[in-house]
Curated annotation (Swiss-Prot):
<dbReference type="InterPro" id="IPR020103">
    <property type="entry name" value="PsdUridine_synth_cat_dom_sf"/>
</dbReference>
<comment type="similarity">
    <text>Belongs to the pseudouridine synthase TruD family.</text>
</comment>
<keyword id="KW-0819">tRNA processing</keyword>
<dbReference type="InterPro" id="IPR020119">
    <property type="entry name" value="PsdUridine_synth_TruD_CS"/>
</dbReference>
<comment type="function">
    <text>Could be responsible for synthesis of pseudouridine from uracil-13 in transfer RNAs.</text>
</comment>
<protein>
    <recommendedName>
        <fullName>Probable tRNA pseudouridine synthase D</fullName>
        <ecNumber>5.4.99.27</ecNumber>
    </recommendedName>
</protein>
<dbReference type="GO" id="GO:0031119">
    <property type="term" value="P:tRNA pseudouridine synthesis"/>
</dbReference>
<feature type="domain" description="TRUD">
    <location>
        <begin position="166"/>
        <end position="353"/>
    </location>
</feature>
<keyword id="KW-0413">Isomerase</keyword>
<dbReference type="InterPro" id="IPR011760">
    <property type="entry name" value="PsdUridine_synth_TruD_insert"/>
</dbReference>
<dbReference type="Pfam" id="PF01142">
    <property type="entry name" value="TruD"/>
</dbReference>
<feature type="active site" description="Nucleophile">
    <location>
        <position position="93"/>
    </location>
</feature>
<dbReference type="GO" id="GO:0160150">
    <property type="term" value="F:tRNA pseudouridine(13) synthase activity"/>
</dbReference>
<dbReference type="InterPro" id="IPR001656">
    <property type="entry name" value="PsdUridine_synth_TruD"/>
</dbReference>
<dbReference type="GO" id="GO:0003723">
    <property type="term" value="F:RNA binding"/>
</dbReference>
<dbReference type="InterPro" id="IPR042214">
    <property type="entry name" value="TruD_catalytic"/>
</dbReference>
Amino acid sequence: MPININKFILDMERFDGTLKKYPEDFIVEEITPEGTVLEVGKEIGFEDVEKWHGSFIHFTVEKTNWNTMDALKQIVRTTKTKRKNFGFAGTKDKFAVTTQRFGCFGLKKEQLENINIKDIVIRDVQKSNKKLRMGDLWGNKFTIKIRGLDLSKKEIKRISDLKLDYVLNYYGIQRFGLIRPITHIVGKFIYERDFESAFYTYCGTPISETGDSLEARQLVDVGEFKKALKLFNRNHDYEKRLIQQYLKYKDFKMAFTALPPQLNSMFVNAYQAYLFNEMINKRFEYGFDAKEGDILEDNTPTGTLIGYNTEFSGGIQGEIEKEIVERENLDLKKFKIEDFGNFYGTRRKMITPIYDFKSSFENDIFELSFKLERGNYATIVTREFTGNLS
């Protein structure tokens, strides 16, 4: 089951290079709703609210080689509090240097300021009366280095002269799984209420594993769950939770209740994203200028994230959307899934602007800098040059 990312905006010969050789090669700086860039290594000095009700504290987390969820787990463990006391505006990947805002309640500023975790810096601690929620950001600024290029001066000039004002608004590989792109497959099985297949796909189905991880997944595939548990390491916490819950209740659907609700939602979201990416591919041949029947956002055609309350476009775009629904044999009402969530069916722009795009060459390194609105993926920009998603 592909992830449906196969069209390009730039008409060019793409070059080979190494992305993310070091975490410092991929810098992600969150941008607040007010437009403030949380710059690496820089104190912002957010002001406390005048009349604090003693509820919420917001703070910036700068981290190297930590993803959002793992960093949060460590912060929770260090402060000896509960996961539900924390929130964040957006998620960030692991192999990078990233900044982002977190929020919490039930803690003192001093507790946060005194946290000492390797490769994590906490600063800009601010008293607030507002809960920080997912989506409370404008977007992100990216500074990316692609190494190991062997290009002629002519090729360098050609690439340096390229202007990239927008990209196809694909969901990136992160939505489906960087190492094991199976999240959308699990999501499809959950939509179909085939929880057994969802379980085996997530816990078994080895793809690129080696060693104990490979053997553990092979054991899952043949039903040797207890043996698999002994081989999965701490990097496979969710697999272990699923298996332990299944062994306790002997029920595949019940097993998924051991996972965080956000993760269970992400499975179905990934299936929606997979279908959306296909809409972009099908719309590509017709162009992305507004056409009769389009539902527009900022004068840009949108596609539907198929859900229980989907509003179909008219015209060509509507035909594309309905064709995919019919091929997948989807019953929209089934996107209300007990214990997993109600997946409404929003819309998303099929192309997205790039802001403040800059590029430069130095020695064998191509450096890109740009800003994207929230929900958009930097790897979709870099693949325009390299052709690769990772």
